[in-house]
Amino acid sequence: LHLSIRRQRQMCIRDRLTVLNAEEDVEKIASMVDFVFCAVDMKKDEIRALEEKYAKAECPVVSNNSAHRHTPDVPMVIPEVNPEHIEIIASQRKRLGTKRGFIAVKSNCSLQSYVPALAPLMDKYKVTKALACTYQAISGAGKTFESFPEILDNVIPYIGGEEEKSEKEPLKIWGHIEGDVIVDATAPAITTQCLRVPVSDGHTAAVFVSFENKPSKEEILQAWKDFSGVPQELQLPSAPKQFLNYFTEDDRPQAKLDRNLEGGMAVSIGRLREDSQYDYKFVCLSHNTLLSLIHISEP
């Protein structure tokens, strides 16, 4: 099975798949698998064409790529946050002419901590603006310390395209279905700064947030504690029992200590306090290579 992949890993591939070409043997591959995880290193127009080819072959596609994230009838899902967007698949299938095949995508890994943290506060307290500075692990670039020695004892203050994705994608996630498309939300206003740091796995975000109806600190903590979603209701194998976890210690969360919480499927939050310019600020952490992609495909 010939795929361009960014990260080199030792993995076992079935013998019957090793002689197949992912671009040329679509029909054959589609007949052999239940669905496709797509994480390829190709041009965006080529990725869009390839993913639609598999979907039209009646093979569901769960994509880690950004190519289809803003296709209006392709759901970009964080399962605890916007599972209702899966309903747009019916419209997508009409466009593609499929009965079973479809495409669903995961969001950019930079926002997988702060979007869930803001989600239970959105409707009741109405988030008006947010600032997030992310400190992103090298695995997000498909790197290890061996392949990326320049990151040692260093911080790189630029990740190409990351800030644009981090500001735009949450608005689709918080959007709504209207007819045959997903319409982006118009609020909150989001600004971001994304840095690459010498950490193997786990993206950390320092978040500042303001509300139309400012909650108390206790109300925020209770909202995080009570928050759960469809993965928890369905008791999916990978679903964390507690999705949002607040640490009272001043030095938490830490990537090294907390990224694997609940098998890497939970979000860790800490240091909630009032801010002089925004209403509140806090720090949150998620495992960038594990969270979300797995249980999008589980139901």
What does each model-found stretch correspond to?
Residues 2-9, 13, 295-299:
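Single conserved hydrophobic/aromatic residue that forms the stacking wall/gate
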Residues 6, 29-31, 55:
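A short, aliphatic-rich alpha-helical micro-motif
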Residues 10, 14, 31, 112-232:
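Active-site-lining helix/loop region of Rossmann-like oxidoreductase modules
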Residues 14-48:
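A structured beta-alpha segment of the ubiquitous adenosine-cofactor-binding alpha/beta core
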Residues 34, 59, 101:
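Conserved acidic residues
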Residues 46-97:
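Rossmann-fold NAD(P)-binding glycine/threonine-rich loop
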Residues 90-124:
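Short alpha-helices
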Residues 191-196, 201-299:
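C-terminal active-site/capping subdomain that shapes the small-molecule cofactor and substrate pocket
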